[in-house]
């Protein structure tokens, strides 16, 4: 297939049509009140099949959300009014949909098959991408088979990825998630400016067998460069200055700065300005993943994402999983007013997935200004949080079941585990996931709780008092994402689903999901405060709180 950029113009949606569709949706919600999900299952024996979608072995079950056929139709009308399909096609055609930075958004190109063509500004992106992938694979194979050696001639045993944000969250999450496929060197991740992070990591490593991957597009990210400098000094102090070139590689587009650091261009893997940090796991930022699981498995990871890309690009509106997922998210956030969503993977190896999604979702859709420069009149992206099941059941599920806020839950489940000898234990995990989903929807009435207490031998008066505490309102919306097994392909498909879902929610909110200006002010102020904290500059034009905190810190340090 041949793709070609269609230029930079981006259509402006008809706000009157969108507002009319949104008001119709809100009137529908007010008229029907709070939907009783339990009643829907009683009235519609085909509720599950009518309110779920499949993509091969991928199942998206949204039957436990408080929506009806009418709701879905009104949501589809909203998608049409927002020109979701047109905006989707604009991304796939290479238009500069990142309007504030005037950039195309083409992480989707990173996972295109080698035999396809994607032209942007006269350049075939697929040719360039495949070239970098081939370079990554050659280098990865050398490290993994031991032919690439450190300065003292020893095989590389440990990899330390130094990055932050998208250069850390994605690689760390994916490497941990794909542990059963990890047959390469040990992988470690350093991101925080807290010196403890780099110090604790280095304390257990051998310099002669350690390779550092410095991941920074601009090679100016403060935390990353600070950690990289500590690592470089560590290598030089043990192996000498000449060892830097053998023990450091870079993933960056700033070749001049990489060279200044001491890393040769032959050990630098590049990526492009149309790759946003939180979408960069598919690029050379994923090098540490390839080092861990090998090139073939990494390509399976890309193919899984491409599978979801094709579905998102070609499936009709009503059968399109990312679009339906996004419309339900918009319904929960904007129409129902639910302020957060919990993502609970019933897979310990996906324990880092909620943190990964926090950046992907909240950095994308945590905006207050629309594409046409107006302040939003409704809530934008929700707070995203979660943990792995069953751990979360013993931590925060109390709030999900009986708290005063309704928090939609997104369960992620795999039918099988990798540990076949522990199959009965995995059955326990699956049973718990299904049970929690049902419990959130079904709840337990006060009367049922009272009967249960009486049956257990508790007297009537105490049963009456305890029944309220042991009742559950139920009717808590939740969705289930089910795949067969956590493989590189399955993980790639899951991540791509969330990428597209977040993009579509941004379209519905009429915001730019691909910039992140909100992180800049804090960086600027930190740069101003650092020399003051070090006593190099005097304080001025500071608020009393900042002045007081600085004075307290300096006094306690004895400065």
From Swiss-Prot:
Pathway: Carbohydrate biosynthesis; gluconeogenesis; Carbohydrate degradation; glycolysis; D-glyceraldehyde 3-phosphate and glycerone phosphate from D-glucose: step 2/4
SUPFAM superfamilies membership: SIS domain
Record-level Gene Ontology MF annotations: carbohydrate derivative binding; glucose-6-phosphate isomerase activity; monosaccharide binding
A Pfam family reported for this protein in Swiss-Prot or TrEMBL: PGI
Residues of the active site: 363, 394, 523
Localization annotation: Cytoplasm
GO biological process, one term: glycolytic process
Superkingdom assignment: Bacteria
InterPro entries to which the protein is assigned, alphabetical: G6P_Isomerase, G6P_Isomerase_C, Phosphoglucose_isomerase_CS, SIS_dom_sf, SIS_PGI_1, SIS_PGI_2
UniProt-listed Enzyme Commission number(s): 5.3.1.9
Subcellular location, principal: cytoplasm
Keywords: Cytoplasm, Gluconeogenesis, Glycolysis, Isomerase
GO cellular component terms listed in the entry, alphabetical order: cytosol
Reaction catalysis annotation: alpha-D-glucose 6-phosphate = beta-D-fructose 6-phosphate
CDD domains on file: SIS_PGI_1, SIS_PGI_2
Protein family per UniProt: Belongs to the GPI family.
Function: Catalyzes the reversible isomerization of glucose-6-phosphate to fructose-6-phosphate.
Entries under HAMAP family matching the protein: G6P_isomerase
Protein's name in the database: Glucose-6-phosphate isomerase
Encoding gene, per UniProt annotation: pgi
